[in-house]
From Swiss-Prot:
Keyword Transport: yes
Localization per record: Cell inner membrane
Gene3D superfamilies: Multidrug efflux transporter AcrB pore domain, Multidrug efflux transporter AcrB pore domain like, Multidrug efflux transporter AcrB TolC docking domain, DN and DC subdomains, Multidrug efflux transporter AcrB transmembrane domain
InterPro entries, per the entry: AcrB_DN_DC_subdom, Acrflvin-R, Multidrug-R_MdtC
Xref: SUPFAM superfamilies: Multidrug efflux transporter AcrB pore domain, PN1, PN2, PC1 and PC2 subdomains (SSF82693), Multidrug efflux transporter AcrB TolC docking domain, DN and DC subdomains (SSF82714), Multidrug efflux transporter AcrB transmembrane domain (SSF82866)
Domain of life per record: Bacteria
Gene name, Swiss-Prot/TrEMBL: mdtC
Source organism of the structure: Yersinia enterocolitica serotype O:8 / biotype 1B (strain NCTC 13174 / 8081)
Protein name (record): Multidrug resistance protein MdtC
Gene Ontology CC annotation, any one: plasma membrane
Transmembrane annotation, as ranges: 12-32, 333-353, 360-380, 387-407, 431-451, 463-483, 528-548, 853-873, 875-895, 897-917, 953-973, 984-1004
Assembly information from the UniProt record: Part of a tripartite efflux system composed of MdtA, MdtB and MdtC. MdtC forms a heteromultimer with MdtB.
NCBIfam families given in the database record: PRK10614.1, RND_permease_2
Transcription regulation is among the record's keywords: no
Amino acid sequence: MKFFALFIQRPVATTLLTLAITLSGVIGFSLLPVSPLPQVDYPVIMVSASMPGADPETMASSIATPLERALGRIAGVNEMTSTSSLGSTRIILQFDLSRDINGAARDVQAALNAAQSLLPSGMPNRPTYRKMNPSDAPIMIMTLTSDTFSQGQLYDFASTQLAQKIAQTEGVSDVSVGGSSLPAVRVELNPSALFNQGVSLDAVRQAISAANVRRPQGSIDSSEQHWQVQANDEIKTAEGYRPLIIHYNNGSPVRLQDVANIVDSVQDVRNAGMSDGKPAVLLVISREPGANIIATVDRIRAELPALRASIPASIELNIAQDRSPTIRASLDEVERSLVIAVALVILVVFLFLRSGRATLIPAVAVPVSLIGTFTAMYLCGFSLNNLSLMALTIATGFVVDDAIVVLENISRHLEAGVKPMVAALRGVREVGFTVLSMSISLVAVFIPLLLMEGLPGRLFREFAVTLSVAIGISLVISLTLTPMMCAHLLRAQPTGKQQRIRGFGKVLLAIQQGYGRSLNWVLGHTRWVMVVLLSTIALNVWLYISIPKTFFPEQDTGRMMGFIQADQSISFQAMQQKLKDFMKIVSADPAVDNVTGFTGGSRTNSGSMFISLKPLSERSETAQQVITRLRGKLAKEPGASLFLSPVQDIRVGGRQSNASYQFTLLADDLAALREWEPKVRAALSKLPELADVNSDQQDKGSEMALTYDRETMARLGIDVSDANALLNNAFGQRQISTIYQPLNQYKVVMEVAPQYTQDVSSLDKMFVINSNGQSIPLSYFAKWQPANAPLSVNHQGLSAASTISFNLPDGGSLSEATAAVERAMTELGVPSTVRGMFAGTAQVFQDTLKSQLWLIMAAIATVYIVLGILYESYVHPLTILSTLPSAGVGALLALELFDAPFSLIALIGIMLLIGIVKKNAIMMVDFALDAQRNGNLNARDAIFQASLLRFRPILMTTLAALFGALPLVISSGDGAELRQPLGITIVGGLVMSQLLTLYTTPVVYLYFDRLRSRFSKKPLMRLE
């Protein structure tokens, strides 16, 4: 009593305390960062190594394997995958969520240093690493286009100036430049002219290397002056290389221009980029794991004026994609839902109380509780994201409950003629324990969530803490500010003035009277009610088993990723045309706003596309519906496939695959893997539960396999190294010299002329000059024939691996897809030497699925323990928890009705319902116990009286919670697909629970009271 009186009798102190909470919350709100979701990125580090000209199998065995053995010893690595392709190896290390990425980076560097001695000596550079996840969608894509500058020059500006500056921005991990390559002097050799002049390709290479050197020449010092010695030892342009003498033939000089075409071009001509149908160079910007997208994008945009000023005016620098607008729009929608929820909740209170003064009290309590939460969010390092704002939206219906219970009870005493100050003290004292029980038991629901490990635990920690803090502040406000305002604002009013909204008052009274009559009948037919209650328990089990499940609601972020996979033997020219064709088809879709893409590099049969959709206000289809519409058009393109996936704010794993979900096959024997992977892929392609099934196994590339006749070579005086050098010089785009410029270094690239790289018959024109100076055609000592060769070799851990990727068809669920995959693997009879496992998001989904029921049971057990402690009873918590089955049925039926799968968001809705619906039972049980103890009523009369007495606050708090969640259900803007499952679950559960628990709770109370009376004579107790 003294505690409550302290605040009621000191209104100034209570008001100032409230203002302090509000002010600190406003400051905290202004300091909070903005992000789409809580920080749940796994620490991922990418290791890169290169050895130009090496085939994929050589890269895998000589580079990937030694590095994997060293990196695999690092503590905290939970997944290590590698891909080795022509001349390059990439190893992805995914660490535990708890691992600090900077500490992991130091361990990676130490492992690379330790493995250096095991790597081939021919590597031009040491392996490097970056703190980035290659599977994460870029946060921004910029394009450079120009009508006057070449693609190589644009690439030079992009890599030398723009990429360097952008990479220095806080939060940026990598800036990948695509669509071309650095400028270079290309020497395109004519094999026939070389043969006629008796000059080998290697002689040309040596002559160019010797003619372009950069060495210190020293200085000259006299007694009075100092001179630096500088010679024209470098050749920097194609014009300078043309007259270079490379050989003398019978005393006549053979110049480079006599046997080759020398042009200013690019290092790798097998690269192409496009944006909206025009050639373009792309700047693909990725963030560090854990970096805030909005803050990073804002920093990059702030640099845009300086970036544009650093390049010529005839070059256009545009932003083709930016992930931040849809994130901001989604957060704006959540904030709008929050405001609507507050307004609806206050409207509910006004309709019930029918008094402006009375409504003002919860109208103050709700925003104070919500605003005060921002302080705790800032101190905990949280952000304003979809989940934390959804927590506040849902909290609107919770935080008003405490104020309503206190306000309604004080109003009841005022209507009985008690003075305001006495009514406030008496009213808050009577329901103080009830409010405390409701709040503590609601917070207890989130304890299992806070203790949950892995990605789901990290994902919902902010949600749980934010909601718990809001409830805690609401508890304080309802026991301090609310009774103080009641004592000073409320007055007993004449009956006529109370009924300002007469229609609603009459309806409410009629409902209450009808409830009393129906409850009286129910209490006389308790067996039927128990049958209904037991039926809801069974129905819960059946609905949970049958409902489709998924990991996380598929978001429409307005961005899509496209991955092109063509025939493994396709040429670069044909692949470039495929890119153009696919971009044309996608660009023609009315929902598409912008398309960029590129192809080339080490894998000539693949390409990437980045698609921006129009804002939701300008299109009627979701991203998934756009993909479904495009899928039919894209299937008509022969020789290649384009796989489209909507960009998600959360993606698990470091694999860069062609679809959203992955199933990995592992084997110690590469031959077994190559035998079974096509069979598994073919079986999965037939499953209707899957779409866009594809594989990263690339073992059917075309190669020309040469067989050396070593005896003939020995007789002719030719070494294998001479023959290999010939092939590398002719077809390897070999970088044979370096041109040094102030801002960058450029290469001299040697290769046969383009017409000779497009026909296998060019091998007949190749020759080697032996030790006797004779020109020996390649065909004299080698034979060749077509064969298959891998374009890439993949590992997971130290095992050979192949990842089959898939998407879901429109309306499909991940649970149905994973179950179908497991059935297919069983029916195929895959041997034990080939192991199958889900990876990435699919793996986390399966792990989460196993723990969902345990999580719900843990929440129920926690609430039971808390209630048992509060009531000093084993029985009364069971009465209160009997409200849960009906809520579960309502939630699951609502999800089925709206065709929404059961996701992590829906799981949180179920957890919230555990906390919400038991409030009704707490109010009934608490008043019934008080009536039995102090009013000398029997159990039936006590629970009947309590049910009628608390009917109005029960109805009010339920409607407040329902209307607080309603804006999430009806939302239709950006991010609605993330909010709707939570709202649907809560609204469905509340409606069903309200209809049933008003009857089941009194019946269960009576049953347990009879059991208590039969087995124990201990008097009823309630903690004060």
